[in-house]
């Protein structure tokens, strides 16, 4: 008799290690069934070639209300009923809505933002320096990793500077895992209400920001409703924020685990881009986002998938696929990259819209942090670092440092 499919999501093996099941499945059963929280079954895809196939094949749907779409928890099942944004649409709706904001996330536009990104990083480090650590270690997550991406995305959206701290705090309550469900839900609602009032203001008095662009180019001509503009702004605000906070903190921890690479980066900050590239492969901070349901019967990796069966493609597992990446479980910022892209930001038409922005922020952070704080040190032993719960995306809840 066939054994019962394992429950998914898998638990990470430890604080920063991906689930051990992935390596076993890549070797023995790369496309296999897993059991979800509600008892339903879905296909789990673990090899690079199959994951990229899932991310690009138009016979698979991203629409969460379709039969068989795999939700990973009760919250996801509830969220699936809400009005979708472009991340949960198929072509042509997906590109129509994504195209409304994509110009603000192109490489060219991000290059124009670079002085502002650098100033944000510099200002936050200066504030940290001023505060000092004479009274004990400082939490690098609270003082730096959280505000860097928060301030930048809020500014792109058009949030006035005076509101940044309060909204950053609300977003932290929403995502940090230590809040109660009620607190997280209240913070969520507060952010939505705030963005709704900002949409109203920008309809009256547009400025040079993303919400004004949506109001002027899309809401006023009747292409989308006001509520859609709020949802798109909310998506851009929350989708990448927790992952960015985690990547900054994980990057610092990873460097201290690899002192020879830390020494290299300190001596030559221009190595930051290749460090960031490896960081995004090694720690897949958004590891559970490539989910689909089959519109028709098809084959993936030699398995027959029926219409209306759910599929979860693990970019986290694909990023450790030895057929693509040499010594994949080794962190090596000097690695020789294959022709294939690492999948930290997904793949295909739904690839993360803010990838260029995220990489610019991370590169600026890691080119600057150790220049300003050459004596930065983690103030607790590695085994005492407070990682995010093992059942979700990899991250660091708080990181006490001295400098």
From Swiss-Prot:
EC number(s) stated in the UniProt entry for this protein: 1.14.-.-
Transmembrane segments: none
Xref: Gene3D superfamilies: Cytochrome P450
Keywords, sorted A to Z: Heme, Iron, Metal-binding, Monooxygenase, Oxidoreductase
SUPFAM superfamilies from the UniProt entry: Cytochrome P450
Domain of life: Eukaryota
Cofactor(s) this protein requires: heme
Pfam families cross-referenced by the UniProt entry: p450
Protein residues bound to heme: 352
CDD domains: CYP105-like
InterPro entries associated with the record: Cyt_P450, Cyt_P450_B, Cyt_P450_sf
Coiled-coil regions listed in the entry: none
Molecular function GO terms recorded: heme binding; iron ion binding; monooxygenase activity; oxidoreductase activity, acting on paired donors, with incorporation or reduction of molecular oxygen
Family: Belongs to the cytochrome P450 family.
Protein name: Cytochrome P450 55A2
Species of provenance: Fusarium lichenicola
Gene name in the database record: CYP55A2
């Amino acid at each position: 008799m066939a054994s019962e499919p394992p429950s998914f999501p898998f638990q990470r093996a430890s604080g920063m290690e991906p689930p051990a099941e992935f390596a076993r499945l890549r070797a023995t059963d790369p496309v296999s069934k897993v059991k979800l929280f509600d008892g339903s079954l879905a296909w789990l895809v673990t090899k690079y070639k199959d994951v990229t196939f899932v991310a690009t094949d138009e016979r698979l749907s991203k629409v969460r209300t379709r039969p068989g779409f795999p939700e990973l928890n009760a919250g996801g099942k509830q969220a699936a009923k809400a009005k979708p944004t472009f991340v949960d649409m198929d072509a042509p709706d997906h590109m129509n809505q994504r195209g409304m904001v994509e110009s603000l996330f192109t490489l060219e536009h991000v290059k124009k933002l670079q002085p502002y990104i650098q100033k944000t990083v510099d200002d936050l480090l200066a504030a940290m320096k001023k505060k000092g650590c004479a009274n004990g270690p400082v939490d690098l997550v609270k003082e730096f990793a959280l505000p860097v991406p928060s301030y930048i995305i809020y500014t792109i959206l058009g949030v006035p500077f005076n509101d940044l701290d309060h909204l950053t705090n609300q977003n932290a309550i929403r995502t940090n895992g230590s809040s109660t469900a009620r607190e997280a839900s209240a913070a969520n609602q507060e952010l939505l209400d705030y963005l709704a009032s900002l949409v109203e203001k920008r309809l009256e008095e547009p400025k040079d920001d993303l919400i004004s662009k949506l109001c002027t180019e899309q809401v006023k001509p009747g292409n989308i409703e006001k509520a859609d503009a709020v949802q798109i702004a909310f998506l851009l605000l929350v989708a990448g924020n927790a992952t960015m906070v985690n990547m900054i903190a994980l990057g610092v921890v990873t460097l201290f685990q690899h002192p020879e690479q830390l020494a290299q980066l300190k001596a030559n900050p221009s190595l930051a881009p290749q460090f960031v590239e490896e960081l995004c492969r090694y720690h897949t901070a958004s590891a559970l986002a490539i989910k689909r349901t089959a519109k028709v019967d098809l084959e993936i990796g030699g398995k027959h998938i029926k219409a209306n069966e759910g599929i979860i493609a693990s970019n986290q597992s694909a990023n450790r696929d030895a057929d693509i990446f040499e010594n994949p479980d080794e962190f090596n910022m000097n690695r020789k990259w294959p022709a294939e892209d690492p999948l930290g930001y997904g793949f295909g038409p739904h690839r993360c819209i803010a990838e260029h922005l995220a990489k610019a922020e991370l590169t600026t952070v890691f080119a600057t942090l150790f220049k300003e704080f050459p004596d930065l040190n983690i103030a607790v032993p590695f085994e005492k670092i407070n990682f995010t719960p093992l059942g979700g995306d990899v991250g660091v809840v708080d990181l006490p440092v001295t400098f």
